[in-house]
Amino acid sequence: TGIKAKFVFMDMFLQDNLSDLVRNMGFSDEDIIWLYSYFTDLKIAPTTYTVKDLEKEIPYDITRREINGKVVKLFCTKEDIFYAAYLRKEGEDIVHRVEKVSRGCLIRKDFYSYTKMFTEYYTPVDNKAHLYQRRFFNEDGSIAYDEIVDGKDSVFRFPDKILSSKQEFIAYFM
């Protein structure tokens, strides 16, 4: 008794905020360690990023808005870009992730909690979006580390270290 348990999650969570998931399972944010945020100074926390926050960050004129269920699309016609904001719940203003599509091609996904947690970068290959990099951030927006993705293989690049596989990444965590 008296020993505080921590639960370590080692998978990527792309569809939902980890805080929302673990709270639904009865855990508190403080009980959780996420492998990918462990090397940042971010806390496990609910999403508070809003569509208005996104609108302030878009450097182009937003010429059209579409709302379809949990997705809000913001179009910048002159630049041939649109942003698809995926809401935590339909009818809310809280954004879990944003996809940036340029000239019909997905080029970036940004994932949020109380700040931007990480970004995925894509390039078109055979008319499909191909993930080639994830960048993980600290609270102040500085880069904590990068994951360079090549299919199922990854290389993790830290300011002072390069880890050549997910196994090395997990071993470094341990």
Region spans (language model):
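Long terminal segments
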Residues: 1-46, 53-55, 131-174
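Repetitive, compositionally biased segments used for assembly/scaffolding
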Residues: 56-167
